[in-house]
Amino acid sequence: AQVVRGITENDGVVLIVGTRPDLRPSIRSAVERLGANGFHVSTERWLPGVLTNASKLLASATQYSVQSQRTQGDLKDESVPNMTQLSTLGYRPDLVIVLNPTENEHAIREATQCHVPTMAIIDTNVDPRSVTYAIPANDDSPRVAELVMGVLSKAGEDGLRRRRAALEAWDKHQRRLQKRRQEPAPLPSDTPS
């Protein structure tokens, strides 16, 4: 939990991978808690290249959304972003959490290839050395996944709260410094002491 807290406190992105339908409710609630710092992959299977070939996958998805908005009349030509710029954007999470690692070995391998730390619920049928942070528990149980995701997402939520508090303290400090700079300097007194 401290890993997730530290990542969200430093404005990191957490990717949650769970490809079984019974895991979707716990994944959705965890992503809602993490807000903009949490994303999920809960399709039927892991799509190869989500991490290693993200620029190509994201470029086509972005182009599709821009094209669909243009056909619906929601998007004007002058507001269309540069497509070459969108295709160079990459997606790289700071942590990948895998809820069912036996079905998502490719996701773990791809994250390892991209040097992204992985965290997974590890049962006796999975090698714990395949992930960076192993959580020893039953990876087949949706209740265990719900419990683990609840703990991890609340830790991430706490990290976001800490980040907000630190940013507010920094902003308050900066405003205080700015106010001191704007105050006129005291005039030296004419009488000797």
Q: Where do the language-model regions lie?
A:
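Ribosome large-subunit tunnel/peptidyl-transferase-proximal elements
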Residues: 1-168
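Internal, active-site/partner-interface "lid" segment
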Residues: 158-193
